[in-house]
């Protein structure tokens, strides 16, 4: 058992009024337990309602006593993780999206599953985060964090892009493809998995490089130590190309641009029910390793 949480900060999925019933249910449940409860400032501004709760920003939250509960889907949880990574505030995800692979609970489970967590009966893990910088003509023009993946990709046309990749200053390959995913272990069950990459356990100290539709039969996904610095240079493109971080932004690229990716010094801190394990989630949500003939 660890220290019980002293306050809860609620975060909602942005631009989605359908989360309001779930937020009200969470608010009522927490207040009935005399738990000091706040609504994240941007969430309140987005839904246009404070739900009668005091507002608190991520910057004002306390990593030593506060719990962030993010209500939404995986996108909400990823955005919350980027916001809290520097401070180390723990996050619990409650799914109100579709699959919700990263969110441990559904809104219907809170009465049973949430009290033990609030009282300190939980497990936690630190998830690595990627730091990406976009350099153009020796000038840094963009920087950001990614919990799942850094994605370098072609625009809307049919032509591939060409990328040259180096690792710690050593040449890895030059490939023509629709794109390149550099994923964390957390991101290995997202886009990288759909593109044929392997699944990594969440706390493994590794990164994945997965090409999207490469024009070759031999460039397989690559797992490397997360201590390396990866530099991907856009060497050719007949159309637009872009850089995306967790799919939440898209930055246009130009020929000669370099994207420098390394593990960030901060990490995402996720909270889970005590009885949960990663392989249970894989089986339950992705039907991983199902035996033939089983339901």
From Swiss-Prot:
It is an enzyme of class 2 (transferase). GO terms for molecular function: ATP binding; metal ion binding; NAD binding; NAD+ kinase activity. Its EC number is 2.7.1.23. One of its GO terms (cellular component) is cytoplasm. It holds the Pfam family NAD_kinase. Gene3D superfamilies: Probable inorganic polyphosphate/atp-NAD kinase, domain 1, Probable inorganic polyphosphate/atp-NAD kinase, domain 2. Disulfide bonds: none annotated. It is found in: Cytoplasm. This is NAD kinase. It comes from Acidithiobacillus ferrooxidans (strain ATCC 23270 / DSM 14882 / CIP 104768 / NCIMB 8455) (Ferrobacillus ferrooxidans (strain ATCC 23270)).
